[in-house]
Amino acid sequence: MNVSANGSVYDALTKAIATLGETGLQVAAYHLGELVVDTWAGVADPETGRAVDGDTLFTVFSMSKGVTATITHRLVERGILAYDEPLATWWPAFAAHGKGGITVRHALSHRAGLPGFKGLAFADQPSLAATGRNLEEATPDWAPGASMAYHGMTFGTLLGRTIELATGKPFAQVLHEEVTGPANIPDLWCGIPADPSIHARVATLHPGN
């Protein structure tokens, strides 16, 4: 641990809470495989005052895109997926409404033409199967590969549902087999496990400023 760097980052976190309206923050940084910063500040649950600590779990949202892409690349290496094959190769129902030409490469590069869900609220996304059904009924906003736009909400379903169907396994299981198990990352999940001791460590989400 780099004591000086750790202290500087801690000071930055407390300043962000004091001046930027942040509630709870946690930072870990590695250099050449060595943990050099591991610090935190603020509260994990504003209602109870539960403080953030080194074991607090945070929802990572779009950081999961990198994990999903990593799984995709690993499956391509083994011939389970292929960059230039249509998603419909493994997910036939996805081909409806002109989506048969959308490939794994298009999905990885945000060029699938499906940057958002239509008629699906954030709270109505219980599973990849459910969000996948929404995309099955969708019509692309442009031809595959013709343009690029950040697929902020749909990236995970485009690739995650394809991964499920190509492997015959739930995405959470594939995540463990391909990433978290081999890399010994015990606290990264797709969906929080039912264990109450894990739920007790999760930071409470609340509307931002």
Segments predicted by a language model, with ranges:
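Short, surface-exposed loop or secondary-structure junction motifs
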Residues: 34, 45, 97-209
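Short, glycine/proline-biased beta-turn/loop segments that scaffold the active-site neighborhood
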Residues: 83-97, 183
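Structural motif detector for alpha-helix initiation sites
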Residues: 60, 83-84, 91, 104, ...
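Short, conserved catalytic-motif segment at the N-terminal edge
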Residues: 1-60, 80-82, 137
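Short, conserved phosphate/pyrophosphate- and ester-handling motifs at nucleotide-, phospho-/glycolipid
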Residues: 65
